[in-house]
């Protein structure tokens, strides 16, 4: 009995701590201006327990630390998306959605115990002073900063800072004798959620949206204006890997494609009246043929946009069933700068469906395993494996759609695991390919710099057998070469390595453009436009695409964050070995 009670003590303490902390006048404001207030509990029993622990426990207890550790425990008993963010992590969690962060404006990696500049972000302070890709940072503010003890978190802490503050960098540059010193005034570094926009062919525009943030709508309009000037008559919006963001950003973009008074989304919760978001009829692209690309990592605000277009029969959805997040969070800030993002409502698509997939409160492990379960049941490979047991709803034309587990696309594109071997998994998950790409780009920067376009660079890499060079590099760095597996994975390895090197020498947008060549999602989209099927019609059946895509996607979203009275995402994700910004 004593053992059982001792096992439950952490839970009781968690409850006591959180309730004790929440009692009072904490509030937040959602985008419509309504305030949320916590109601004082009529019972002080749990807060009394916390006081007793503080006063009488056998050992001294760090109560602040106990609060920090307890709050996530109690919140996960509610739902998978109510979360606690410590004060030190709040700024980072908001960075990509705010549209900018304060720092020097570089993308870096740590290689051979040295901080290396991979990319200088356009419009940032580092660009103004002349920092270049390939530069080695060997000292920060006069203190040597090299060796095995340096890490990513420490580097970001030293390079980021308040706008207007200074940081002194000592840099070693290839081909230059001695060291160079730079005094950089930190400033606002732009963060764009429209990763790429270009013409797929003479009449088809392509836009990749990686998240829904403060700048998304403005970036989207700028991209659309540019594509329109180039003769765009059809549009592909790529939301693969887009984990979500602000509801208003998704609503604003959806408004551009809908006639007046079309419902886009509505929210409803126990303490919130139903709130509807409708189009205002001033959208510029109401008749533009539209295809939306989604996959299992398209979530939240991405599902709002795709759901609004599908329910209004405004676009054709291509890909795989989306993540299935239909919960709305509101941020509640504490005096110490920390934050709770609490689920306060559900959102519903125009047909009335909630796309939130089922979950068991407190069973976070099962919820997070859902995507693996989909793979195990064959859902990624066969559209017939998609469960459609949820409630049926109808679009404006009367097409059947389903609630309770994401957006099911109109055309299914399966995965192909042909090139996936244990060797490929090892070099991918270890970050070895990213490491090699930096090494290769850095050691061949002068030669590769003469190749003026991403397409020319990609062709050069294929001619020079980059896969063999990578296999030799990996073997020297701890991954034993396995020739049969390398042959099996050759096409996939070549694709990934080419994309990484292009990203290092040009930028992620150029890499995405190279990676999209031959993409089965895009081939299907072009066929839909060619066949005049971008606007869905009644009686059209969902079909599988006969071509296959590779996995994993090279540029999946790096961040997905729950923020504002809007939408969260799933969990933050990143590709192994990814570079960081500062």
Regions found by a protein language model. Name each.
Residues 10-27:
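Hydrophobic membrane-insertion alpha-helices, especially the h-region
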Residues 1-8:
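Short, Lys/Arg-rich N-terminal segment immediately upstream of the first membrane anchor
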Residues 57-121, 164-196, 515-526, 533-544:
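Extended, small/polar residue-biased N-terminal targeting/export presequences
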Residues 2, 26-42, 46, 50-54, ...:
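Cleft-lining beta-strand/loop regions that shape enzyme active-site pockets
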Residues 354-355, 359-562, 568, 575:
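Conserved functional hotspot residues or short segments at active or partner-binding sites
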Residues 301, 313, 320, 324-391:
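Polar, glycine-rich mid-to-C-terminal structural blocks
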Residues 567, 579-582:
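Short, solvent-exposed mixed-charge patches
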Residues 134-136:
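Structural motif
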